[in-house]
């Protein structure tokens, strides 16, 4: 307290604690982690909560191929806060971490690791390299998660490569196939030419690309219904005008699609006629920079042109004019270039016209085949410019506009993808879509917009392409008849494959021939033959992770189905949330989760996406090294994670300051609890001063706020309530006011303050334990213990409101007292500015009061009132006087206190020297020293 040494310093009860002001978290946290591991914290916590209601937060498996980033840290810490809080709230909340271990990124890493040998290794050898890579990264990522303070069963995580997982996944596939939800067919799918595999919608990301949009004319070759003759239009000079942004698909053109409900016009340019939608004539002419043209005759219904024929722009074949409702007037010409092999709408409309072939002149690597004629061997992206140049030279191109548009990219390699019709395995969403809608309605979505988002995605999505033309994954468990090629999936084959995988893992698919796997007696339903081959595709990794509700929730004895919560980032609405929902509804008829909680992306301090190339990223390891994991955890709690969360070095620096204020509150209290034994030194409630009861009432309000925040997973609310309590209620008020009582007195008055502070810190520490898991344990270790307190704070019960609650009259009284104190502080500041006083203890305050204010202030003993104002003397005077204040009926005047300054407590008093042995002490301090 004193800056200058005094002979009485040793008689003061100055704060004394080994709890350090500087946190030193980067060094302390690893020691705590070691202690938690040696004492088996997680498993003992589960035993401690055995028999309590369960809360199951099911972990969405991160991909096991690299170090964690800030987004992963955000995700895992949110989960850990929930798990810790639920375990303190009266639940047994196990946490089984999972890892997604199959898929293309790992396969590509494995291939790159073998270099030139990749052409020589077998599929089985490649899979073994992949498994080794995935397993190594599981260990790396697990250590990184634990370093963040995440607790869970890391000794027994669930892995999608485990035999028992793969076996259960096969069974889910079989259940869906049995219900008719799995089929194989030719359809256009997202295809990555670089990865050489089909992709699901969840594996697509959109980026802005430059492209040439062109208007191309196709010459009419046949008019079987005499439409042109009817309107006096010469067929040999008539063209349909199409618009496309994918020039490379023109070799696959087999039809031009019109809308039968739209009107079309004949536009004469020179002596040639061009058919296009009436409403789009002007925009087409403007785009083609054609100013001299004439619309001939009246508009014609699009339906009249059906089944006309036209010549391909360069190949020796004819196409068909067909009708489709997907044709709009939003852009283009109203005549849609239709290549059934390269577009979903195109494919679907062509299915209505059996005479229209599906042509796919592009191979797995994105190269045009001989079906493209002279462009065979060209990569599709290069072919765009070559075909455009040739068609422009031939006069087929009427106009060209360079545009930027959003184009789909592979989220693995980030390169543009194409639509390509191939034989693939699909999950028929259309067959159970209504059931999915009903399941969505049973789920609690947080934020609530998640309900409509998921419903909209399910409504708009096509059938799910679940096959991939790769090696590292769970094989499609299908057999093919050698004689007729029909695929074969039965209950018996599914059981045989599942049993085999459970015993040997999915590598067995590559070890044995089909006849060694398929049960004896299986015959082809179509031709009766019994010789077989195996499917060579693997399942989409989203089918892997989408099966966790069966392979994990139903199989692990400590878990249950459905989960109470799935919690992931917003991108999982098209990923894990959705794949899990689809497989669960398809196999069980219900959602796999009762609630879904969603968080946003991590962005930089300016709100921009983090990229290594931009140099705006920040790594969890950097923050841990500089500040400790608790600061990352505080960042998570202080953020509104339902939207994008900003992260950066400045933000973490600011948070470290906020953390310091919370830590110093705890340190001050611990320092003043030196020598305090809660088993013997706690005073009864009626011995507490009013301000102590006010502090406990403020604590009760904190409990109410934080309980409410935790209940709805609003940790931002918890953080702000804790921060304001520590800074405003404690440091700026209660702890400041009680310093004289703590430092300068002994007996009941001091013990009353210590009693309140002890209860405050015990409660506060429990409240922050789910968030600041390391710091709260450090505080807990320094707190004096009572019987029944656990070694680890996470084993304690979360505080419940009511124990320290005060009635509204008491709260109103103290709100008024604090308002009076604020007015006194203003006057003291003015007196300090005028050099009347220095420190506030040099002041004597006169309060001029009306009757109501007088009665309020007079209800507090004058020495306690002086302590409340942190002055040496307070006098109450009925009537007007002093400076007017914001408190009605109150005037405030301040003067230098009379008497001398006590060497020990620094208060001014006229009792200085009243004890001859202590001539520099006030009577109060002299009696304390002599006691």
Regions flagged by a language model, labelled:
Residues 255, 262-335, 344-348:
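Protease-associated
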Residues 100, 189, 193, 199-207, ...:
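Acidic, turn-prone loop/beta-hairpin segments
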Residues 189, 407, 478, 521, ...:
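Residues immediately within or flanking Cys/His clusters that coordinate Zn2+
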Residues 47-109, 242-251, 257, 322-349, ...:
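N-terminal catalytic cores of NTP/NDP-binding nucleotidyl/phosphoryl-transfer enzymes
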Residues 192, 410, 481, 524-527, ...:
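Short cysteine-rich clusters marking metal-coordination/redox-active sites
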Residues 222, 319, 353-366, 470-472, ...:
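Alpha-helical recognition segments enriched in aromatics with Gly/Pro capping
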Residues 2-25, 31, 35-39, 111-251, ...:
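Residue patterns forming the tRNA-binding/recognition surfaces of aminoacyl-tRNA synthetases
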Residues 196, 469, 485, 528-529, ...:
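Cys/His-coordinated zinc-binding microdomains
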């Amino acid at each position: 307290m004193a800056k200058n040494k005094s002979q009485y310093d040793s008689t003061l009860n100055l704060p004394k604690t080994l709890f350090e002001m500087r946190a030193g978290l980067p060094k302390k946290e690893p020691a705590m982690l070691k202690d938690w591991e040696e004492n088996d914290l997680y498993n003992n916590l589960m035993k401690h909560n055995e028999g309590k209601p369960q809360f199951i937060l099911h972990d969405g498996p991160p991909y096991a191929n690299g170090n964690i980033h800030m987004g992963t840290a955000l995700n895992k810490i949110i989960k850990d806060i929930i798990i810790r809080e639920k375990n303190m709230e009266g639940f047994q909340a196990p946490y089984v971490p999972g890892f997604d271990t199959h898929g293309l990124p790992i396969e590509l890493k494995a291939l790159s690791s073998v270099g030139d040998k990749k052409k020589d290794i077998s599929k089985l050898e490649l899979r073994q390299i992949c498994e080794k890579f995935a397993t190594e990264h599981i260990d790396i990522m697990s250590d990184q998660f634990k370093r963040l303070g995440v607790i869970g069963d890391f000794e027994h995580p669930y892995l999608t490569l485990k035999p028992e997982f793969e076996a259960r996944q096969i069974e889910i596939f079989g259940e869906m196939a049995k219900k008719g939800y799995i089929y194989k067919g030719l359809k256009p799918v997202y295809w990555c030419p670089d990865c050489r595999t089909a992709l699901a919608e969840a594996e697509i990301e959109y980026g802005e690309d430059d492209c040439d949009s062109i208007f191309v004319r196709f010459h009419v070759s046949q008019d079987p219904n005499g439409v042109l003759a009817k309107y006096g239009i010469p067929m040999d000079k008539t063209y349909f005008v199409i618009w496309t942004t994918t020039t490379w698909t023109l070799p696959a053109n087999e039809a031009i699609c019109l809308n039968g409900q739209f009107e079309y016009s004949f536009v004469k340019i020179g002596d040639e006629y061009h058919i296009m939608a009436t409403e789009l004539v002007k925009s087409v002419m403007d785009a083609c920079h054609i100013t001299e043209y004439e619309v001939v005759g009246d508009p014609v219904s699009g339906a009249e042109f059906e089944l006309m024929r036209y010549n391909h722009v360069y190949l020796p074949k004819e196409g068909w004019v067909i009708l489709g409702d997907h044709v709009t007037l939003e852009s283009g010409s109203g005549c849609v270039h239709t290549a059934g092999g390269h577009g979903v709408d195109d494919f679907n409309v062509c299915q209505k016209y059996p005479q229209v072939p599906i042509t796919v002149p592009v191979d797995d690597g994105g190269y045009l085949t001989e079906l493209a004629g002279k462009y065979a061997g060209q990569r599709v992206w290069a072919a765009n410019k070559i075909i455009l140049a040739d068609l422009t030279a031939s006069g087929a191109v009427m106009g060209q506009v360079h545009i930027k548009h959003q184009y789909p990219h592979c989220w693995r390699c980030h390169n543009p993808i194409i639509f390509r019709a191939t034989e693939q395995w699909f999950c028929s969403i259309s067959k159970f879509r209504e059931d999915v809608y009903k399941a969505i309605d049973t789920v609690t979505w947080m934020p609530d917009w998640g309900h409509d988002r998921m419903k909209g995605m399910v409504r708009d999505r096509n059938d799910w392409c679940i096959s991939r033309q790769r090696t590292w994954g769970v094989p499609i468990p299908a057999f093919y008849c050698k004689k007729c090629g029909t695929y074969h999936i039965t209950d018996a084959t599914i059981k045989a494959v599942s049993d085999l995988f459970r015993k040997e893992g999915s590598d067995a698919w590559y070890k044995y021939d089909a006849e060694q796997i398929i049960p004896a007696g299986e015959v082809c339903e179509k031709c009766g033959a019994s010789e077989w081959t195996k499917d060579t595709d693997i399942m989409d990794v989203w089918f892997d992770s989408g099966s966790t509700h069966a392979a994990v929730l139903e199989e692990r004895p400590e878990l249950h189905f459905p989960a109470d919560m799935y919690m992931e980032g917003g991108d999982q609405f098209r990923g894990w949330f959705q794949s899990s929902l689809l497989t669960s509804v398809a196999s069980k008829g219900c959602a796999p989760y009762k609630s879904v909680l969603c968080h946003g992306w991590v962005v930089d301090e300016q709100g921009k996406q983090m990229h290594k190339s931009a140099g705006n990223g920040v790594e969890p390891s950097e923050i841990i090294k500089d500040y400790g994991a608790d600061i990352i955890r505080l960042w998570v709690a202080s953020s509104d994670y339902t939207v994008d969360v900003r992260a950066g070095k400045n933000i973490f620096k600011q948070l470290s300051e906020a953390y310091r204020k919370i830590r110093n509150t705890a340190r001050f209290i611990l320092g003043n609890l030196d020598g305090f034994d809660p088993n013997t030194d706690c005073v009864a409630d009626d011995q507490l001063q009013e301000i102590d009861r006010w502090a406990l009432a403020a604590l009760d309000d904190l409990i109410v706020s934080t309980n409410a925040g935790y209940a709805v997973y609003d940790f931002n609310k918890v953080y702000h309530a804790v921060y304001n309590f520590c800074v405003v209620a404690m440091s700026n008020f209660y702890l400041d006011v009680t310093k004289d009582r703590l430092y300068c007195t002994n007996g009941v008055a001091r013990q009353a303050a210590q009693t309140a502070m002890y209860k405050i810190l015990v409660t506060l520490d429990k409240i922050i334990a789910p968030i600041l898991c390391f710091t709260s344990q450090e505080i807990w270790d320094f707190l004096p213990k009572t019987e029944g307190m656990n070694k680890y704070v996470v084993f304690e019960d979360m505080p419940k409101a009511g124990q320290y609650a005060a009635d509204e009259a008491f709260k109103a009284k103290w709100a008024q007292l604090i308002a009076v104190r604020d007015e006194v502080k203003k006057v003291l500041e003015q007196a300090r500015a005028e050099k009347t006083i220095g420190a506030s203890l040099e002041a004597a305050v006169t309060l001029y009061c009306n009757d109501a204010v007088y009665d309020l202030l007079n209800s507090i003993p004058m020495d306690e009132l002086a302590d409340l104002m942190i002055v040496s003397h307070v006098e109450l005077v009925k009537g007007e006087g002093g400076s007017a204040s914001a408190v009605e009926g109150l005037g405030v005047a301040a003067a230098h206190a009379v008497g001398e300054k006590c060497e020990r407590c620094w208060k001014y008093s006229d009792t200085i020297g009243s004890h001859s042995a202590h001539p520099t002490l006030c009577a109060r301090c002299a009696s304390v020293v002599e006691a």
